[in-house]
């Protein structure tokens, strides 16, 4: 949770202006990585396309079992002769050239219904995590020279039309190092995805969130790793790619001011666009547990420790505890040694 009450607005030349904006209440949302990971996985499933294997795959042979009495398995075998293929097993999922086990069907349950309250909570938590520099650096963003997080810039950025204007802005705001990280991370994908129109993979850079439909999307879209979104249509898969918190966000001034209107405050039902929604409050106002248990209020309510406590007497079984048996009957050790000697004779 960001602790600063005010956020400075920077112009397109990355110079601090006189205007300051109060930090929206959504940045005080409790950070729930478990919820964000789960909801991101559910939302990602809704983008899947139904696919299946051919119903004839692995079954296009003339094969029949040889039956019993041949000292071979009763799996169907290819008919004929004159080739290595004849006599080989067919059809079964354990056979070369056979069908797969449990072939994929198009009527699989591909999509998931996502709880809207959990989805809003996850988006709010992802926004709150974007205001913590430690989480941004843990995710791999290069923000060593960034003056302030969350980073808010003037609305002149929304009027950018050319990519070269966006590049100049990113260089001035010391964010180009994060873009160079994206360039250097481009590599070949492992697996068969290379054959399916996704040969390369690379890291992600910052995401630009604007307030009104502007032309800045055309300026930033051709820069590798940079995403652009409208503040009224935020996508959890871009705020927390892979379900991981800590995406670097560049807010425009108008978008930053709309957050209280969209996501509300700590007052119940304060959101104007999301019915019945307000910013979730943390269960513990102070998460420093050691400070709580050492506070005067808690110490006064707790009984002082006893100086000479009377411990209850523990009754032990001497038949199972040999040391206790020897205390009660010292001669038992002699009897035990004598019995062992008799056994050896």
UniProtKB/Swiss-Prot annotation:
Q: What is one term from the GO cellular component aspect held by the record?
A: cytosolic large ribosomal subunit
Pfam families tied to this protein: Ribos_L4_asso_C (PF14374), Ribosomal_L4 (PF00573)
List every position bearing N-acetylalanine: 2
Q: Which UniProt keywords apply?
A: Acetylation, Ribonucleoprotein, Ribosomal protein
The reply on keyword Cell cycle is no
Task: Name the GO terms of the biological process aspect.
Answer: determination of adult lifespan; translation
Q: Which GO terms describe its molecular function?
A: RNA binding; structural constituent of ribosome
Q: Does the keyword Acetylation apply?
A: yes
The similarity comment for this entry is: Belongs to the universal ribosomal protein uL4 family.
The protein in question is named Large ribosomal subunit protein uL4
Tell me what organism the protein belongs to: Caenorhabditis elegans
Name the gene that codes for it. Answer: rpl-4
